């Protein structure tokens, strides 16, 4: 089977012909378009490789399409307020949405609203899961970036205030974008802010690793998969490349007169809103307020292709095309449930249905598997049979035991003699 | 006869009479001279190899004298050593091992003078030897110290404390490493172990009792005071050392610990882009080893005693068990229960000192236990064991006061004070009470509040009264006080009581003329409460009225503070920034109200504070709820006037762009924030670079060297300073960008045009930077959709000519204006290339017959340069007739005199570029 194709998913703020377009990365061939509504910034997410979710700009619902049935709007998920950002867990189990200053967490299989997190003081601007879905990071206009552990968020009892794992408060102006690197709980997170800095954090320790100060406010940030470079989109349309690995050995060889221009991608005329790097790290995709999406060659910093859209670009990302996207026969494994507007447990009739829904993993296997007691008996039987076999196989065993006991006895005797002797020696001078 | 007489003369008998003095004999020896011994203190021999002191003794002699049996020799050797080492400090490094081993050996000398000399020498040496140099010898030093502390002679014990003082002052880290031995020594100094058989089986806490030694020169109370003072110093060093390692907690230890600065990298993009700064984020990829590591293969300080010092909770518990009964005994002795009844009138000085030291030691122990106590087991253990004792002994007469000493006893007390001045020269009963409250309060927590309410209430009352009393508190007292208040607030669920406390602190805060550390502490206290409140979720969040009043007052304070106290301003800005970013409504409202003062271009905080604070203030603009027109005009003045720094001004323009309706997504227009009109007028006035008043003032300038005048253009140029010019130029870049990103290009161009024609057309004196910047913006904004206003063109043409004239008449020597040349030339040429009609108008205005003869060469040179400029050539070609006419006029005007070089050049250029052009001559011919 061939390697999965890389495609580009873009949305713009005007959404005249379609709200979302998918094109092939290298050829630029238009593959699919989805119609209905305008997706807001940082509001596009792929759910489980089966659905496409788009938070609507300034409206309080999320559009959901089945990936292969492009023209048909599948569902409108109603939310309590305008959605400012949206993301899904990589395993497709949870949907996170930032609504005003709160973060809403839905479980996809039931559609229950599990938790509302309100630790931000102003609007949440971006949300990202780590690659393994164990943590997520949220950042907002209150200059705070918070790293949450999904487990602790889900398990906490409602009486207690949910606390994030880390609070990163070093930014001094609103955070515009964040990127979560590779490595699950060990990942590094890059945050970009209008205070002209990009900062790199470690989720595991919560430390600030790096802070880069620029000349202008930074509106978007991304890293390549190997985390060799950070790409930062500025508010004037330049894209800066920060190298995270320096090669001191190379410094003598590299004599390039135009060194300082070698780290800026120039071409956009207005602020860069979104950045994305292909999986091999060779191609950079950028979307801007100047209504164009550009494709850059990372190595030579040249613009490969410019696609002009009808409005400011709200989302542009390079993703690996899931099989369902290109196969019209594909059907989702799970129908999208009705997403609840109210918190689980806070609803009136919730106890009636919620009481019996405690799932236990592996329950369906219970019939086939023996219980622990049975297993213990089995183990004992095996052990005893082995022992018996050994005993029977070698009649030497009792004799051997006898020998050993004898040796122990003799050793004890020697020890006692030694003790007596030494006490005699020691006590003699005092005599 | 004569002979006989003569002989008689010779042997005349002297008659001695009673009552007369005996005449002196002639041969008597004169004994009235005085003799003096010749004293040779120095050897005459000069040892060339080793430096010597005044007595010509070298280090070897001196060290060998240390083994002399006589105390006097040893003392003089020590003095000589000090003399030698002060003259030749390099000997210290070379002979450190010998010197230390000899000097420390005499800590236990029998002769008091020798010990005194040794202590003095140590006092002299300690500042010169760094910690890492002495650390290999420290086991030796501390061994001698502890042998001196445990010595049987009292004098040696007393002097050992002086040694300890020196070591504590200079090597706190090293000496705390030996805490296991030293703490035991401390205990032994003031007590002895009960060895009677009946007590052996009882727990060890009971087996130590205070000892009284009648042989001492000082009373046993004074002795204990001395020892306890050292003990508390020692524990302080211990606590400081360990708090450096652990994360500090509480208000007292709020030292600035910049979050993980050790391993985070801060770089500037420009340096990185120029390859001046490399980034190495991942430690495993680093080619350089990490040199800042604290790891040592061999542990130098503590050899095998690691398990006994106070770093583990168990050991600390053991030490507390021993020391606290002793301390309580000291307390009882200082304040006997039968006297305690009269305590209301006050306690005398000396017992008060003892009490204070006792409490100091306890509070330090508490602090240590808190540092090690992760699970609060130690806390509950302390509470269980000691709460009753403390309540009984300490709290029964709680607020202690100092009794005024009566006159009769003055002599007596003077003497005792003399002993104690070393320890603490002033007794601070307030600090004593506060320390006691601190200790007691740390024993309570929210769950035990019910049981403790009686004494907690006493403490609360005391704290509130002290705060409200308005007494001048120093920062140490206040620190304790706020620590107690914080703890009280933390464990108190009752809002009214909390509110009272906060109110009391607020009354203190409102006092005028507080010292900076005091003010800082108060601000920190409030910001801590504020942060704690903010952490709660919305349902539980409770806004203290006093707190919000405090917060709301901050912007006004900041605006009034001005440049008087930049540090305080920085703190205020920090808190305001935090609260503003958290969208605290009260604060934002007040910030809005105070904004006009803060951002005042003349004396507002934004221009008078240092650059760091300026940046924070500029960033604060982002959070302002609305940006009215007057504020914007002030901000534009701030940008223009150059007191803000060009990069900061650019940041400001960027932030305003972010807040304007042009940056957001189309739906999220915050129309109440800032109207587009205001925003555009801000941009335009920033672009102009001069206020209206300044421009009208400029109009009356004539004949000043700063004004350039030509006879061919109605517009005069005012020459700005280079600094101002460059600043203006940088800002224009930012304004240009802000204008460029506005989606409707033609509209913004129109607005700019109409603004220019309204405000600038008609002026006769224009600053050169303004003219240049306007050209720059027009060049950048102009595209095919824009329509240029006809009325504007003559103005542009005359400006352009004035600028070009200025550039061409620039003298080589004028270094200041030479730097402007490239920039101005570039914008002039590009505006001429973009707007051919401006070029045409300019050429039309060159009526050379009106020009002065000095101006003619300049016009000629200008024409030549324009002809040579490639982008302009086609436009010049279309205006060929005009150009030819001008040249003809110049030639006729100049015909009388000798043909000059510039005219020849001009003719040549014209013939090459225009006449030589294939179409050029044909058009000309057709026309003629």
Swiss-Prot record, chain A:
PROSITE patterns attached to this UniProt entry: WD_REPEATS_1 (PS00678), WD_REPEATS_2 (PS50082), WD_REPEATS_REGION (PS50294)
UniProt-annotated location(s): Nucleus, Nucleolus; Nucleus, Nucleoplasm; Cytoplasm; Dynein axonemal particle
Sorted UniProt keywords: Cytoplasm, Developmental protein, Nucleus, Repeat, WD repeat
Subunit structure: Component of the 5FMC complex, at least composed of PELP1, LAS1L, TEX10, WDR18 and SENP3; the complex interacts with methylated CHTOP and ZNF148. Interacts with NOL9. Component of the PELP1 complex, composed of at least PELP1, TEX10 and WDR18. The complex interacts with pre-60S ribosome particles.
Disulfide bonds: none
WD repeat feature ranges: 36-75, 78-116, 119-158, 170-211, 213-257, 267-306
Function recorded in the entry: Functions as a component of the Five Friends of Methylated CHTOP (5FMC) complex; the 5FMC complex is recruited to ZNF148 by methylated CHTOP, leading to desumoylation of ZNF148 and subsequent transactivation of ZNF148 target genes. Component of the PELP1 complex involved in the nucleolar steps of 28S rRNA maturation and the subsequent nucleoplasmic transit of the pre-60S ribosomal subunit. May play a role during development.
Keyword RNA-binding set for record: no
Family: Belongs to the WD repeat IPI3/WDR18 family.
Taxonomic lineage: Eukaryota, Metazoa, Chordata, Craniata, Vertebrata
Top-level taxon of origin: Eukaryota
GO cellular component entries: dynein axonemal particle; nucleolus; nucleoplasm
Pfam families noted in UniProt: WD40 (PF00400), WD40_alt (PF14077)
Protein name: WD repeat-containing protein 18
Swiss-Prot record, chain B:
Gene3D superfamilies given in the database record: Leucine-rich Repeat Variant
Subunit organization: Component of some MLL1/MLL complex, at least composed of the core components KMT2A/MLL1, ASH2L, HCFC1/HCF1, WDR5 and RBBP5, as well as the facultative components BACC1, CHD8, E2F6, HSP70, INO80C, KANSL1, LAS1L, MAX, MCRS1, MGA, KAT8/MOF, PELP1, PHF20, PRP31, RING2, RUVB1/TIP49A, RUVB2/TIP49B, SENP3, TAF1, TAF4, TAF6, TAF7, TAF9 and TEX10. Component of the 5FMC complex, at least composed of PELP1, LAS1L, TEX10, WDR18 and SENP3; the complex interacts with methylated CHTOP and ZNF148. Component of the PELP1 complex, composed of at least PELP1, TEX10 and WDR18.
Modified residues (Phosphothreonine): 29
Name of the protein in question: Testis-expressed protein 10
HEAT repeats: 99-137
Function recorded in the entry: Functions as a component of the Five Friends of Methylated CHTOP (5FMC) complex; the 5FMC complex is recruited to ZNF148 by methylated CHTOP, leading to desumoylation of ZNF148 and subsequent transactivation of ZNF148 target genes. Component of the PELP1 complex involved in the nucleolar steps of 28S rRNA maturation and the subsequent nucleoplasmic transit of the pre-60S ribosomal subunit.
SUPFAM superfamilies the UniProt entry points to: ARM repeat
Similarity field: Belongs to the IPI1/TEX10 family.
Domain of life: Eukaryota
Cellular component terms per the entry's GO annotation: mitochondrion; MLL1 complex; nucleolus
Lineage: Eukaryota, Metazoa, Chordata, Craniata, Vertebrata
Location (main, coarse): nucleus
Gene field: Tex10
InterPro entries membership: ARM-like (IPR011989), ARM-type_fold (IPR016024), HEAT_type_2 (IPR021133), Ipi1_N (IPR024679)
Coiled-coil regions listed: none
Compartmental location: Nucleus, Nucleolus; Nucleus, Nucleoplasm; Cytoplasm
Record keywords: Cytoplasm, Nucleus, Phosphoprotein
């Amino acid at each position: 089977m061939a390697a999965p194709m890389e495609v580009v998913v873009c949305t713009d703020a005007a959404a005249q012909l379609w709200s979302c377009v998918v094109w092939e990365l290298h050829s630029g061939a238009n593959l699919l378009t989805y119609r209905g509504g305008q997706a807001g910034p940082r509001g596009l997410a792929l759910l489980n490789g089966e659905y496409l979710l788009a938070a609507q700009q300034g409206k309080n619902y999320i559009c959901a399409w089945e990936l292969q049935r492009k023209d048909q709007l599948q569902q409108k998920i109603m939310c309590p307020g305008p959605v400012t950002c949206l993301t899904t867990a990589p395993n497709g189990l949870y949907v996170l949405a930032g609504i005003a200053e709160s973060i809403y967490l839905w479980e996809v299989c039931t559609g229950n609203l599990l938790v509302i997190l309100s630790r931000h003081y102003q609007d949440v601007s971006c949300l990202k899961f780590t690659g393994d879905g164990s943590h997520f990071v949220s950042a907002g206009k209150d200059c705070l970036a918070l790293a949450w552990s999904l487990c602790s968020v889900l398990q906490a009892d409602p009486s207690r205030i949910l606390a994030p794992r880390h609070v990163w408060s070093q930014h001094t102006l609103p955070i515009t974008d964040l990127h979560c690197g590779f490595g699950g709980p060990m990942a590094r997170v890059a945050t970009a802010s209008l205070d002209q800095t990009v900062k790199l954090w470690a989720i595991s320790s919560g430390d600030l690793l790096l802070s880069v100060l620029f000349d202008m406010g930074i509106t978007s940030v991304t890293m390549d998969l190997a985390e060799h470079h950070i790409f930062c989109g500025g508010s004037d349309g330049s894209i800066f490349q920060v190298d995270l690995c320096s090669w001191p050995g190379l410094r003598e060889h590299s004599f390039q007169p135009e060194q300082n221009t070698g780290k800026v991608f120039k071409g956009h005329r207005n602020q860069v809103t979104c950045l994305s790097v292909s999986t091999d790290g060779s191609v950079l995709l950028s979307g801007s307020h100047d209504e164009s999406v550009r494709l850059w060659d990372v190595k030579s910093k040249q613009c490969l292709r410019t696609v002009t859209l009808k409005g400011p670009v709200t989302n542009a990302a390079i993703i690996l095309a899931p099989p369902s996207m290109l196969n019209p026969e594909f059907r989702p494994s799970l129908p999208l449930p009705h997403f609840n507007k109210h918190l689980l447990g806070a609803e009136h009739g919730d106890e009636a249905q919620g009481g019996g829904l405690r799932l236990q993993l592996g329950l369906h296997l219970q019939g086939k598997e023996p219980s622990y007691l049975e297993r213990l008996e089995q183990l004992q039987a095996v052990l005893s049979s082995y022992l018996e076999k050994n005993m029977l196989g070698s009649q030497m065993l009792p004799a051997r035991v006898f020998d050993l006991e004898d040796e122990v006895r003799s050793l004890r005797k020697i020890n006692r003699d030694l003790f007596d002797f030494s006490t005699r020696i020691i006590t003699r001078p005092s005599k | 006869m004569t002979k006989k007489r003569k002989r008689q003369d010779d042997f005349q008998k002297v008659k001695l009479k009673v009552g007369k003095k005996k005449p002196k004999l002639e041969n008597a020896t004169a004994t009235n001279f005085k003799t003096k011994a010749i004293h040779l203190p120095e050897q005459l021999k000069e040892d060339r190899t080793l430096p010597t002191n005044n007595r010509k003794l070298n280090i070897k002699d001196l060290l060998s004298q240390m083994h002399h049996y006589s105390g006097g020799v040893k003392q003089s050797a020590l003095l000589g050593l000090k003399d030698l080492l002060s003259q030749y400090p390099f000997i210290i490094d070379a002979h450190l091992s010998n010197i230390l081993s000899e000097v420390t050996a005499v800590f236990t000398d029998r002769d008091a003078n020798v010990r005194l000399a040794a202590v003095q020498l140590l006092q002299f040496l300690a500042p010169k030897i760094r910690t890492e140099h002495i650390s290999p010898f420290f086991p030796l030093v501390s061994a001698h110290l502890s042998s001196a502390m445990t010595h049987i002679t009292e004098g040696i014990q007393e002097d050992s404390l002086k040694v300890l003082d020196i070591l504590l002052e200079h090597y706190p880290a090293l000496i705390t490493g030996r805490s296991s031995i030293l703490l035991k020594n401390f205990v032994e100094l003031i007590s002895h172990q009960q060895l009677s058989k009946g007590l052996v089986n009882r727990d060890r806490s009971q087996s130590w009792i205070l000892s009284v030694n009648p042989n001492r020169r000082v009373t046993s109370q004074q002795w204990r005071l001395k020892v306890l003072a050292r003990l508390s110093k020692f524990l302080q060093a211990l606590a400081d050392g360990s708090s450096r390692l652990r994360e500090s907690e509480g208000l007292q230890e709020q030292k600035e610990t910049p979050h993980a600065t050790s391993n985070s990298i801060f770089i500037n993009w420009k340096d990185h882009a120029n390859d001046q700064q490399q980034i190495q984020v991942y430690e495993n990829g680093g080619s350089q080893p990490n040199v800042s590591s604290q790891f040592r293969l061999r542990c130098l300080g503590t050899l095998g005693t690691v398990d006994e010092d106070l770093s583990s909770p168990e050991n600390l518990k053991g030490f507390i068990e021993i020391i606290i009964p002793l301390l309580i005994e000291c307390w009882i002795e200082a304040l006997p229960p039968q006297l305690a009844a009269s305590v209301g009138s006050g306690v005398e000085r000396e017992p008060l000192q003892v009490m204070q030291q006792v409490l100091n030691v306890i509070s330090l122990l508490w602090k240590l236990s808190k540092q090690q106590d992760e699970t609060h087991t130690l806390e509950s253990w302390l509470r269980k064991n000691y709460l009753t004792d403390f309540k009984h002994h300490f709290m029964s007469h709680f607020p202690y006061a100092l009794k005024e000493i009566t006159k009769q006893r003055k002599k007596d007390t003077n003497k005792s004070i003399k002993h104690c001045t070393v320890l603490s020269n002033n007794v601070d009963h307030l600090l004593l009470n506060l320390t006691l409250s601190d200790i007691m309060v740390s024993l309570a927590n929210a769950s035990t509040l019910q049981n403790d309410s009686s004494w907690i209430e006493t403490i609360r009352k005391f704290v509130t009264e002290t705060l409200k009393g308005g007494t001048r508190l120093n920062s140490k007292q206040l620190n304790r006080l706020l620590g107690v208040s914080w703890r009280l607030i933390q464990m108190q669920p009752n809002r009214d009581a909390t509110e009272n406390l906060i109110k009391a602190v607020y009354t203190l805060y409102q006092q005028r003329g507080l010292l900076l550390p005091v003010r800082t502490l108060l601000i920190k206290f409030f910001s801590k409460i504020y942060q704690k409140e903010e952490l709660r979720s919305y349902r539980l969040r409770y806004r203290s009225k006093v707190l919000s009043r405090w917060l709301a007052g901050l912007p006004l304070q900041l605006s009034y503070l001005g440049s008087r106290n930049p540090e305080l301003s920085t703190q205020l800005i920090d808190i305001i920034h935090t609260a503003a970013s958290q969208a605290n409504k009260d604060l934002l409202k007040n910030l809005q109200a105070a904004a006009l003062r803060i951002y005042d271009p003349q004396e507002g905080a934004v221009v008078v504070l240092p650059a760091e604070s300026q940046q924070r203030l500029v960033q604060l603009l982002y959070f302002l709820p609305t940006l009215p027109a007057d504020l914007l005009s002030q901000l534009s003045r701030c940008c223009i006037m150059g007191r803000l720094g060009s990069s900061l001004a650019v940041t400001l323009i960027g932030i305003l762009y972010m807040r304007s309706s042009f940056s957001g997504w189309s739906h999220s227009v915050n129309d109440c924030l800032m109207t587009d009109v205001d925003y555009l007028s801000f941009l335009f006035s920033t672009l102009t670079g001069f206020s209206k008043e300044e421009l009208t003032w400029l109009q009356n300038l004539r004949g000043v060297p700063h004004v350039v005048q030509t006879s061919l253009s109605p517009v005069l140029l005012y020459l700005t300073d280079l600094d101002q010019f460059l600043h203006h130029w940088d800002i224009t870049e930012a304004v240009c960008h802000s204008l460029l990103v506005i989606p409707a290009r033609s509209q913004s161009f129109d607005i700019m045009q109409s603004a220019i024609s309204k405000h600038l057309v008609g002026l006769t004196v224009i600053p050169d930077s303004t003219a240049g910047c306007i050209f720059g913006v027009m060049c950048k904004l102009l595209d095919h959709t824009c329509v240029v206003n006809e009325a504007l063109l003559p103005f542009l043409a005359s400006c352009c000519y004035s600028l070009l004239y200025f550039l061409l008449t620039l003298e080589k020597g004028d270094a200041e204006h030479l730097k402007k040349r490239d920039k101005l030339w570039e914008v002039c040429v590009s505006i001429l290339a973009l707007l051919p009609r401006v070029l045409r108008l300019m050429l039309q205005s060159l009526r050379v017959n009106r020009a002065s003869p000095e101006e003619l060469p300049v016009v000629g040179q200008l024409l030549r340069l324009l002809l040579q400029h490639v982008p302009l050539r086609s436009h010049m070609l279309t205006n060929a007739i005009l150009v030819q006419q001008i040249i003809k006029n110049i030639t006729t005007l100049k015909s009388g005199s000798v043909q000059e070089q510039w005219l020849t050049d001009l003719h040549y250029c014209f013939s090459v570029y225009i006449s030589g052009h294939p179409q050029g001559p044909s058009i000309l011919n057709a026309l003629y």
